[in-house]
Amino acid sequence: MGRAAILLGAALGLAAVGARAAVPDDVRMKGPFLIASTPYLADGAVDFDALVAEARYLDAAGCTGVIWPQSNDSIDLLTPAEKREGLRRLVVAAASFTNAVLTMGVSGTNTAETLAFAAFAEELAAQSPAPVALAARPPTDARTAAEVEACFEALGRVAKRPVIIQTFVSDDCPAPSVAFLVDLARRFPGVYGYIKEESEGARANARQAEEIVAKPVVKTVFSAWGGWQWLYQRRALGTEGLVSERPAYAPLVAHIWRTMQAGDPDGRLQEAYAMYRYLIDQRAIPGGSLRGYSLHYLKKLGLFRTTLSRTYLSSRVTESGTFGVGHDWKLVDLELTDAQRAELDANFEGMRRFLAREAAR
């Protein structure tokens, strides 16, 4: 038994340290699985207390899953030790979750790193009384379909619980084919069949349609890319959740999902979704909506102590956008004018009023 398991067992007060964690069933593996943003202290160190507070906020808001680490900056710019410590803290916190499945990101630069993180995550999960899942994307350094496929096949032999596959990393790394994803789900039925379709635009819709046709071998297809097409993909294609780094809007995202599940009986789903789209589309405000100005909200909520980010020293522009390169970073603060803060605050208060009205109906 590893040291991580012993320490976690002590933290959770488990009498039987070797007990196997509950594995979430397919019903739990649907809905908004939001990616937690990584918070930082003034010196650039990871603020693990804030990370736990953020995860608890997502759970209390009604999200069905909390994923960490999963976004590019958290995968590339955190040290292995920082990722392990964050996961330890989150597994302890997840014991008191009432809604969310803790989903541990195990993505690595290569297959060996991915498998090492997965083994560590399984060691932690084996001590958790709460259901735990995993999430992975193709290894950053993979350049051929064969390399991507080999990684997921190897991971399928290590994982003992559901793994959400994110299909896209960068233009340099090929996305796994739909045929391969379906075959994986058939060969590893307790592990695969949960897909975050990360392709963009019309290609995402085409792939999702293929994946959903493969049900019940494929269990859940999640919308992605911030939820830009979530409403269409739910109504026209049948996606059953969202995976995205939009933690500040968790109460609204959870409300949208509940309304989707209920079949939109009052015809108000489109209004709720329009509110969400407006919140994430403040393009004139610095930083973008993925992390950027959302940090202002996370700090205002009392979850984060700073609005600092580790930012790539190098980046590259591709057809799919601008992507960070390497593992070197600088510490950058979010800088907003008073007018920008006022606009963001007005938008957030609008969301709160909307949710209060919906709750009173």
Feature map (PLM): residue ranges:
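Bacterial N-terminal signal peptides
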Residues: 5-15
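Structural alpha-beta junctions
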Residues: 91-99, 126-131, 160, 190-191, ...
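Active-site beta->alpha loop and helix N-cap motifs at the rims of alpha/beta catalytic domains
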Residues: 23-175
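Structured C-terminal cap/extension of enzyme domains
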Residues: 49, 232-361
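Catalytic alpha/beta core domains of metabolic enzymes, predominantly
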Residues: 154-162, 169-290
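General structural feature for long, well-ordered alpha-helical segments within catalytic domains
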Residues: 47-50, 54, 82, 86, ...
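Boundary at the C-terminal end of the N-terminal hydrophobic targeting segment
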Residues: 19-21
